[in-house]
């Protein structure tokens, strides 16, 4: 769900410097070296973790069971050894391409991707865990979204963001009491 993942390497962009350095740390644990750089944008800095060195790219592709020449990128279920792997994958996908509205205004969590098959597979993974996702095409991007507050709370908890789930629960109770 990054900017790209192919024989050129991988690029993950985020507004959170800690997320970029965490990606670097995880790849390093797997034996793949990458770099983090900061790019200034009018809206603020964007941090980019990348693996571009050809030797490191080869290691990365082998690690994930890809050649880098696939016509369409797919999620490979065999890469998930346990439930924690699935949870970490979905959480990382959210960090790469997810957004969530302010719960004071509405309840909406989205994953956006230009990759059609990848989006379909993510939707299926979320449905398999009863998060009740929906899919739409918006401005050329595949959007997987969840609108029900209770499903958003469950997904956030599943991804390890229990504090964010509790804030939504608190806001929902506040809204219901008004």
Model-based region annotation:
Residues 1-33, 37-39, 72-129:
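Intein-associated homing endonuclease modules of the LAGLIDADG/DOD-type, together
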Residues 57, 61-63, 103:
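Structural preference for solvent-exposed beta-strand-turn elements
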Residues 36-41, 134-138:
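Short beta-strand
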